[in-house]
């Protein structure tokens, strides 16, 4: 895929709707149907070549947890772009012209169960802080996208539940412009703080309509806070809000009775 093509598509989508992957803002970036890769690629294989010579990153649902942390294929949080590319087996390019590893997103095409999309890595201060896979389109371009990602989302949710248990958090709400958002999140919690998270995030047309956007990925809140402290964006003594476990919440409620 030519860099100009990717940058044009992603720039267009940046002007549309965006969602948050945990505390990190993640922008949906997916190409319109007519621009999707033509090659039929198995999602169960490693990164493979399309008929146009592109390298497609595989989405391996079993590879989102390593040593108790939510991260993709063991890529350490705050790894360099080069380290991530070596593990993924592809070269990623800036989502927009002018983006760099100090603060930016880097993308490459992917395909999963017949749906074309992108993998995106968010970097801050030269380190990876989130990795996600995006399918479909944004709210501004949904009329040009005739797909429905409901079946794919259901499959991912089923697989994640089998692999990682029931989600720790489920969000279901209507957006101001009428479309519906639904999200699922699995959390790694240490000392009451969310360290890393795995998420599924979906956007639907109003009144239970078709799903036109799907994001699947992991992020590190701990890494993000660490970097922001290093660059002086937040104070050194900053502490994230403590997340209570269900047992702690129950004890707290009993104590107030």
Region roles according to the model:
Residues 41-45:
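Extracellular mucin-like PTS domains
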Residues 46-105, 130, 135-257:
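Non-cytosolic coordination micro-motifs
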């Amino acid at each position: 895929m030519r860099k100009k093509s990717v940058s044009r598509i992603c720039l267009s989508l940046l002007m549309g709707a965006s969602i948050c992957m945990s505390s990190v803002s993640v922008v949906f970036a997916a190409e319109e149907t007519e621009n999707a890769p033509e090659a039929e690629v198995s999602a169960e294989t490693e990164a493979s070549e399309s008929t146009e010579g592109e390298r497609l990153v595989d989405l391996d649902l079993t590879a989102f947890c390593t040593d108790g942390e939510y991260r993709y294929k063991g890529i350490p949080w705050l790894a360099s772009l080069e380290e991530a590319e070596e593990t993924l087996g592809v070269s990623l390019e800036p989502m927009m012209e002018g983006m760099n590893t100090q603060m930016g997103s880097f993308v490459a095409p992917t395909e999963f169960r017949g749906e074309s999309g992108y993998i995106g890595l968010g970097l801050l201060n030269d380190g990876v802080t989130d990795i996600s896979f995006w399918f479909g389109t944004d709210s501004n371009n949904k009329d040009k996208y005739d797909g429905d990602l409901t079946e794919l989302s259901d499959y991912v949710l089923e697989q994640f539940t089998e692999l990682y248990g029931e989600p720790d958090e489920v969000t279901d709400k209507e957006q101001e412009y009428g479309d519906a958002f639904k999200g699922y999140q699995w959390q790694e919690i240490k000392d009451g703080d969310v360290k890393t998270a795995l998420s599924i995030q979906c956007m639907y047309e109003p009144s239970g309509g078709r799903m036109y956007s799907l994001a699947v990925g992991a992020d590190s809140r701990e890494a993000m806070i660490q970097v922001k402290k290093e660059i002086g964006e937040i104070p050194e003594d900053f502490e994230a809000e403590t997340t209570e476990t269900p047992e702690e919440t129950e004890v707290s409620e009993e104590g107030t009775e």
